[in-house]
A protein has these predicted regions:
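Extended surface/linker regions that mediate inter-domain or inter-protein docking
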Residues: 13-27, 133-197
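C-terminal capping alpha-helices of c-type cytochrome domains
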Residues: 18, 23, 104-110, 116, ...
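Gly/Gly-Pro-rich "capping" loops immediately C-terminal to redox-active cysteine motifs
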Residues: 40-48, 73-106, 121-134, 162-171, ...
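C-type cytochrome heme-c attachment and multiheme electron-transfer modules
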Residues: 170-194, 201, 238, 249, ...
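The canonical Cys-X-X-Cys-His
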Residues: 57, 63-72, 107, 141, ...
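Detector for the c-type heme attachment site
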Residues: 69-75, 112-113, 126, 146-147, ...
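Electrostatic cytochrome c docking/interface patches
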Residues: 37-62, 101, 172-204
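N-terminal type II signal-anchor transmembrane helix
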Residues: 2-37
Length: 279
């Protein structure tokens, strides 16, 4: 009996040591990654502030998922609190918030590269969705943000908690999207607006963060287990859908059989897209 208890105690000790070691490594990897800096030298943007540009920027803000995290007014909010994983907060993007002293190119670096003015990476910003955003679209979005009514709203701090760091250790959590991106300087010119595969691919970049880079679906990274999965969007799953079915899904939030799509999928934002953007 004494040998058995000694064996159990030893096993528990090894397990505890292993857990402590894993969390220690997770903490070290996270802190080292947060301390890394990136250089962004994309060609300077030309930001226009005419009525048409501001309207286009507002359209992008409303249809590219920005409002889901930052709010319709851009003043930021608590997105979710996932207990031991993280407290995800989207910052205030109005002139009264985080962007008030930033240049257009610094804002562009945050949007397309996930990089702060000091070169450090942004946490959990879905930059992969915006990395290929064209220069004119990016400039229009920035013009709109800079023209928003200033708000003093402070949604509080973002917190990276132990389980997020542990998942990040094993590359199971997209904590710092900047790590996965190519930061080589280049201009970005999107394909012409129209009902083409090239333009559809350009618009669909905004779906990567939830549905995955290959659009095959996944549990949305970082969200609590109770949140629904993002479904498979490839022909293997949606091969029977017609164009009208896609329009109904994105405009009405309904599947071909009439059942409702979970509101976690932000179809209300996509409903504001133009016919060309959906087609």
């Amino acid at each position: 009996m004494r040998k058995f208890l000694k064996y159990v105690a030893t096993l528990l000790g090894v397990l505890v040591l292993g857990v402590l070691l894993a969390f220690g490594l997770a903490w070290f990897k996270t802190e080292r990654a947060l301390d890394k800096t990136y250089t962004v030298n994309d060609p300077p943007l030309t930001v226009l502030r005419d009525t048409e540009t501001l309207a286009h920027g507002g359209h992008l803000f409303a249809t590219r998922g920005c409002t889901d995290c930052h709010g319709a007014d851009g003043a930021g909010k608590l997105v979710f609190d996932a207990g031991p994983v993280m407290r995800l907060v989207a910052p205030n993007l109005t002139p009264g918030g985080r962007l008030k002293d930033r240049t257009a190119d610094q804002i562009a670096a945050a949007i397309r590269h996930g990089v702060k003015p000091d070169g450090h990476p942004l946490i959990f910003m879905p930059t992969q969705d915006f990395h290929e955003m064209g220069d004119a679209d990016t400039a229009a979005l920035i013009a709109y943000l800079q023209a928003l009514p200033a708000s003093a709203n402070d949604p509080g701090p973002l917190e990276i908690r132990p389980l997020a760091k542990l998942m990040y250790l094993f590359d199971k959590f997209p904590l710092l999207p900047a790590e996965k991106l190519d930061h080589a300087p280049r201009a970005r010119t999107p394909p012409p607006v129209g009902r083409t595969a090239a333009y559809g691919q350009y618009v669909a970049q905004g779906c990567i963060g939830c549905h995955g880079r290959n659009f095959a679906g996944q549990h949305v990274p970082g969200t609590p287990p109770s949140f629904p999965d993002a479904r498979n969007l490839t022909p293997a799953a949606l091969g029977g859908w017609q164009e009208a079915d896609f329009f109904r899904a994105l405009r009405e939030g309904k599947r071909p059989d009439g059942s409702a799509i979970d509101p976690f999928m932000p179809w209300q934002a996509f409903a504001k897209m133009s016919d060309d953007e959906i087609a």
